[in-house]
């Protein structure tokens, strides 16, 4: 089947679904048809744009062959042909991108977890910088940023921190942030001006609802204990801290931020669902991709993905060899779009090359 035939088949399916929805179907059949119709809507819109440009190019070429056209008209037609010939490859690429298999998690909100890695207190300070950077980015995008938990060091650093980021397509934008982030800078306590290197790990998980991941009570072990502060001292006289273990997978989440055990449990369950869902999603993706390497957003947390060099004022993403000399704009103001957009474009190009 040719590319054009395949596109015509998709448009036919979309139009038939529209007729089906207008015919008065109900229940599960309506829900299924509505979902399919919505999934095809964007694709069909791009197909129609592509077909329109193709049709206009054919008409312009035919018109050019007509006898008796004056020079001004010929020049106008040739300009139109040139414009359409330039736009067609872009429109075709847009159609192919729309036809790529979708990650079902892309439209979801996200949970982001930042943990200090190697580098002691410097790593904890860097983890706090990264966490604040993502908060700024969320604000720029108009997303809702809710802190779930912070384990601080007492002097400005974070051992670990997590947040829920709600909005449209949040996960599709942030999933490429998963991995090891490295920082090179001169600590304030460094008297000889030596550059220290430390790291923090970022994990981005799709936020899921109860309907996506059902947790059975029999599969959960819930432990409660007294919460402690940065120095290890107990800061609460009641067992408000919660540790939940999902027995089948061994995944564990511990929360002690809230004074209420109930609130800590609710937050811990939210993170637990996200981690279980992400584990299942990753296994499916691995199987579907047939061990494809180098995938942007694969979530490989052992992969060093980006370096923040403060003395040089640069941020370098090692996956796409992109370096920006605007560290303050990126880190302090959360201006991540240049990296995010470039990573998404690179991922799309790799997937298109496999078609």
UniProtKB/Swiss-Prot annotation:
Entry comment on modification after translation = Methylated by PrmC. Methylation increases the termination efficiency of RF1.
The UniProt record lists the keyword Cell membrane: no
**Example of a GO MF term:** translation release factor activity, codon specific
Output the Gene3D superfamilies linked to this UniProt entry.
Answer: 3.30.160.20, 3.30.70.1660, 6.10.140.1950
Q: Which PROSITE patterns match?
A: RF_PROK_I
**Where found, per UniProt?**
Cytoplasm
Q: Which SMART domains match?
A: PCRF
Q: Region entry Disordered: which residue ranges?
A: 280-310
Positions carrying N5-methylglutamine are 233
Q: Please provide, in alphabetical order, the Gene Ontology terms of the cellular component aspect for this entry.
A: cytoplasm
Q: What is the lineage of its organism?
A: Bacteria, Pseudomonadati, Pseudomonadota, Alphaproteobacteria, Rickettsiales
Renumbered to this chain, the signal peptide range is: none
Protein family according to the UniProt entry: Belongs to the prokaryotic/mitochondrial release factor family.
Q: Which Pfam families match?
A: PCRF, RF-1
Q: Which gene encodes it?
A: prfA
Major site of localization recorded for this protein: cytoplasm
| Keywords tagged on the record | Cytoplasm, Methylation, Protein biosynthesis
What does the record give as the function of this protein? Peptide chain release factor 1 directs the termination of translation in response to the peptide chain termination codons UAG and UAA.
Under SUPFAM superfamilies, the record lists: Release factor
Query: What is this protein called in UniProt?
Result: Peptide chain release factor 1
HAMAP family given for it?
A: Rel_fac_1
């Amino acid at each position: 089947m040719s590319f054009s035939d395949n596109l015509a088949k998709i448009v036919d399916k979309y139009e038939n679904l529209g007729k089906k929805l207008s015919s008065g179907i109900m229940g599960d059949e309506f829900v299924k048809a509505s979902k399919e119709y919505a999934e095809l809507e964007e694709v069909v819109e791009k197909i129609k744009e592509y077909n329109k440009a193709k049709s206009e190019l054919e008409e312009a070429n035919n018109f050019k062959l007509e006898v008796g056209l004056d020079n001004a008209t010929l020049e106008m037609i040739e300009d139109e042909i040139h414009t359409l010939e330039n736009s067609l490859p872009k429109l075709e690429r847009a159609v192919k991108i729309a036809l790529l298999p979708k990650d079902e998690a892309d439209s979801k909100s996200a949970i982001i977890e930042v943990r200090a890695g190697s580098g002691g207190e410097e790593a904890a300070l860097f983890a706090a910088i990264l966490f604040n950077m993502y908060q700024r980015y969320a604000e720029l995008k108009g997303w809702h940023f809710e802190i779930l938990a912070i384990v601080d060091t007492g002097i400005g650093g974070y051992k670990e921190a997590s947040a829920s980021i709600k909005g449209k397509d949040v996960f599709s934008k942030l999933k490429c942030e998963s991995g090891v982030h490295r920082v090179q800078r001169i600590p304030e306590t460094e008297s000889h001006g030596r550059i220290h290197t430390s790291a923090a790990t970022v994990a981005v998980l799709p936020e899921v609802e109860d309907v996506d991941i059902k947790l059975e009570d029999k599969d959960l072990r819930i432990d409660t204990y007294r919460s402690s502060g940065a120095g290890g001292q107990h800061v609460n006289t009641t067992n408000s801290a919660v540790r939940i273990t999902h027995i089948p997978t061994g995944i564990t989440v511990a929360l002690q931020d809230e004074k209420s055990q109930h609130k800590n449990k609710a937050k811990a369950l939210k993170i637990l669902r996200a981690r279980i869902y992400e584990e299942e999603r990753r296994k499916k993706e691995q199987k579907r991709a047939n061990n494809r390497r180098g995938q942007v957003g694969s979530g490989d947390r052992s992969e060093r993905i980006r370096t923040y060099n403060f003395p040089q004022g640069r941020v370098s993403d090692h996956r796409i060899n992109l370096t920006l000399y605007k560290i303050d704009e990126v880190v302090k103001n959360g201006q991540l779009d240049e990296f995010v957009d470039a990573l998404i474009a690179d991922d799309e190009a790799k997937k298109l090359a496999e078609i």
